[in-house]
């Protein structure tokens, strides 16, 4: 008798919620269906959008006979790393001028977070330090917890961020948690367009946050997934990162180019490292090279080439910023329109938070039962947390979504 499969006892894992939601949406035959869960930009026709500047650069790359398919260096395409870090920090960054910045090309924002987490688990404060507390916001993007756990960190904690009652930032709770955190703890910070709440600190609030972190020697690890995409301004969306650098912080910044270039399946990311001295950067990158070597060995080239060529050419750069603003402006319009319709319907509660939030997502305040009603009765797909992707709204479905939310809030408590 043959022995049972060595895989017989492997348990079935739960599906990734946001991807399961999209699969359910696709299988739904109802013509009214709306997908507000997908984490990607959509046009007013509910279609993916390839940025015109990306099409142009892809064509140029295809026609460039000097390009081959040799391995990139382990740390990635040099021009991409330089351009990406400069985008985050600004051309006039003192850290760049003093050559104490390094970049590592990674597989999207998740890859940048993972390489940063793996490095910190091995070398933070010069030692293997997996007992260091890592703080993530409550709520946060679900991958933040998983990435740091997978890197070996044993103490993942949450810090206050969202005030459900006022549907805004719990600044005092945030500051209190910073004060109570052990010195040298790691804090994962959303650079802009906080996921899932869409609520960001103001510059003055960021200054308060930085002041406590500086005094208590807390390490900032920024996640920058939406630069330019949140407000339409590259500078505004990078304000917090640049302020922390100006205050003398050493920090990591995981950058994603999925949203602001529409390069979701190219997995284009960069980990920007800011240190106090140039020598530190050389040593840090030498260790990150070892980590990358055993993780994916060498990164893919196509997406990095597209981003590098666009960011390094003034004409293409200007076209790209225009494309990004087109996306950001459509999201802002959908926010205004949804709020206006809910208020016109006199939907119970307050809805000003929809326009006060920023970026792709809105934390609506809908409870899980109301979400269940919207999915089952109205075929409107969103996450149980009540988070919606504003890009899923269009001029064609806005009225239906607003009246459905009104119905859910009115009927279901």
UniProtKB/Swiss-Prot annotation:
Subunit composition and interactions: Homodimer.
Membrane-spanning ranges: none
GO CC, one annotated term: cytosol
Family statement drawn from the similarity comment of this UniProt entry: Belongs to the class-I pyridoxal-phosphate-dependent aminotransferase family.
Cofactor: pyridoxal 5'-phosphate
EC number(s) recorded for this UniProt protein: 2.6.1.1, 2.6.1.3
GO molecular function: L-aspartate:2-oxoglutarate aminotransferase activity; L-cysteine transaminase activity; phosphatidylserine decarboxylase activity; pyridoxal phosphate binding
Recorded catalytic activity of this chain's protein: L-aspartate + 2-oxoglutarate = oxaloacetate + L-glutamate; L-cysteine + 2-oxoglutarate = 2-oxo-3-sulfanylpropanoate + L-glutamate; (2S)-2-aminobutanoate + 2-oxoglutarate = 2-oxobutanoate + L-glutamate; 3-sulfino-L-alanine + 2-oxoglutarate = 3-sulfinopyruvate + L-glutamate
Superkingdom as given in the UniProt entry: Eukaryota
Name of the featured protein: Aspartate aminotransferase, cytoplasmic
Residues bearing the modification N6-(pyridoxal phosphate)lysine: 259
UniProt keyword annotations, A-Z: Amino-acid biosynthesis, Aminotransferase, Cytoplasm, Pyridoxal phosphate, Transferase
Major place of residence: cytoplasm
A Pfam family: Aminotran_1_2
Subcellular location field: Cytoplasm
Primary role: Biosynthesis of L-glutamate from L-aspartate or L-cysteine. Important regulator of levels of glutamate, the major excitatory neurotransmitter of the vertebrate central nervous system. Acts as a scavenger of glutamate in brain neuroprotection. The aspartate aminotransferase activity is involved in hepatic glucose synthesis during development and in adipocyte glyceroneogenesis. Using L-cysteine as substrate, regulates levels of mercaptopyruvate, an important source of hydrogen sulfide. Mercaptopyruvate is converted into H(2)S via the action of 3-mercaptopyruvate sulfurtransferase (3MST).
GO biological processes: aspartate biosynthetic process; aspartate catabolic process; cellular response to insulin stimulus; fatty acid homeostasis; gluconeogenesis; glutamate catabolic process to aspartate; glycerol biosynthetic process; malate-aspartate shuttle
